[in-house]
Structures are given as structure tokens and as C-alpha cells.
């Protein structure tokens, strides 16, 4: 019972953090409204990581269920999608999304670079979430599936009411670790010309008025990533 309460508190805390991040992004909190094209700094880091957390987990669950599907087409698509994106570094996916994807679009088609980056990070996150969810489902004894079926529950009812709640307690530590990794990986968007909090700190240190006073921004950035 104590262990179940701990997992419940951890899950509640995780979704509370995600809800707070989304609320800050939607309401702009105390930040001045900034155009998407000019967004940068810590706000950009929160936007990218927030979308990756919110979109990556549901998509990962769908991919994990697709990988366990008995339908060959769905299973083959899910396996191929997961393995391809997991085998490619995030830097490569970001470069392909921002530099190569527009080449295949019709002439005159323009897409916000931030949208491209968010989509790339969400796809990358969902593939890792899929493997975490799949490992959690495999930890559930087969008898739980049979018990749910014996009382007349369908596939989706069994997953939603019996299997997934039990599997979630096995997945929470890995999910949290993956979200932390994604938050740190947002620094890679500097490669495609976007200034996250770390890139903004570096740019600040090269600015003439900030010469010799760049220790504080780097220290604050280090504290944020450490926390």
C-alpha cells in the first residue's frame, strides 16, 4: 500500500509539473508576448520540452500498443517507425526537419522553424516513450490480461482499466528520466539556428556590455539544468 501511494504521488507530481508548464506557456505568465519567430532563451526551452512531454507520451503509448498488435501492417509500421527514429541522433532529425523537409514541399510553402523543431523533438521523444511503455506492459503478468478478458472487458477496456494503471508504476522512473534527458537535449536546437537558454547565455557572454560579467548567467543556467 505504501509503495502504491508513492507511485501515485510521483504520478500526480509529474502531471502537475506538466500542467504548470502548459499553463505558463498558454497564459504567457509574467513574460512579454513574443512572436514565435523571435522566441528564445528559457521560454524556448520550456516550449520545446513541454510539447515533447505532452505529445511524446500519448504517441509513445500508441506506438507501443501498435508494436504489440496482432495486425501485421500496424506492427510492421510501428516497429519500423520506432527503430528508425531511435537509431538516428536527435541532431540529425533536427537537421532533416529544418533543412531537408522544406526541399520536398511545394514551391512557396513555408513552415515556422519552431514548429519543425517541435515536431522533430516530439517524434524523437515518442519513440523512446514507446519502448518505455512496452517494457512496462511486458512486466505485467499474462494472468492480468486473462482476468480482464474473463470478466468481459474488451481490448481497450482491459488496457485502460486493468493493464495500463499497473504498468504505469513500472514506467514512471524511466519516463521521468527520459523527460529530464529531453529537457537537456533542447540545447541541440542551437545547431539549427535557434537560441535556447544555453545558446542565449553564450551569446550574452560574447556581447561587449557583458564582457567580464558572464559568470552569473552561466551559473544560473547550470542551476536550472541541475534542478
Language model region names:
Residues 1-227:
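Transmembrane alpha-helices and adjacent helix-loop boundaries
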Amino acid at each position: 500500500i505504501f509503495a502504491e501511494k508513492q507511485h501515485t504521488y510521483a504520478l500526480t507530481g509529474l502531471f502537475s509539473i506538466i500542467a504548470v508548464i502548459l499553463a505558463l506557456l498558454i497564459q504567457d505568465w509574467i513574460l512579454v508576448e513574443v512572436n514565435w519567430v523571435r522566441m528564445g532563451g528559457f521560454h524556448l526551452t520550456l516550449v520545446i520540452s513541454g510539447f515533447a512531454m505532452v505529445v511524446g507520451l500519448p504517441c509513445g503509448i500508441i506506438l507501443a500498443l501498435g508494436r504489440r498488435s496482432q495486425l501485421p501492417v500496424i506492427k510492421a509500421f510501428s516497429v519500423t517507425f520506432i527503430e528508425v527514429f531511435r537509431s538516428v541522433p536527435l541532431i540529425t532529425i533536427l537537421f532533416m526537419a529544418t533543412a531537408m523537409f522544406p526541399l520536398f514541399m511545394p514551391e512557396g510553402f513555408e513552415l515556422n522553424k519552431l514548429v519543425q523543431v517541435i515536431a522533430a523533438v516530439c517524434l524523437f521523444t515518442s519513440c523512446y516513450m514507446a519502448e518505455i511503455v512496452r517494457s512496462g506492459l511486458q512486466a505485467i503478468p499474462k494472468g492480468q490480461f486473462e482476468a480482464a478478458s474473463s470478466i468481459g472487458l474488451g481490448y481497450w477496456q482491459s488496457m485502460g482499466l486493468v493493464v495500463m494503471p499497473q504498468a504505469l508504476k513500472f514506467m514512471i522512473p524511466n519516463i521521468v528520466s527520459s523527460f529530464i534527458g529531453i529537457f537537456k537535449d533542447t540545447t541541440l536546437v542551437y545547431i539549427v539556428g535557434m537560441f535556447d537558454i544555453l545558446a542565449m547565455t553564450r551569446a550574452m557572454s560574447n556581447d561587449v556590455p557583458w564582457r567580464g560579467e558572464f559568470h552569473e548567467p552561466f551559473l544560473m543556467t547550470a542551476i536550472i539544468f541541475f534542478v
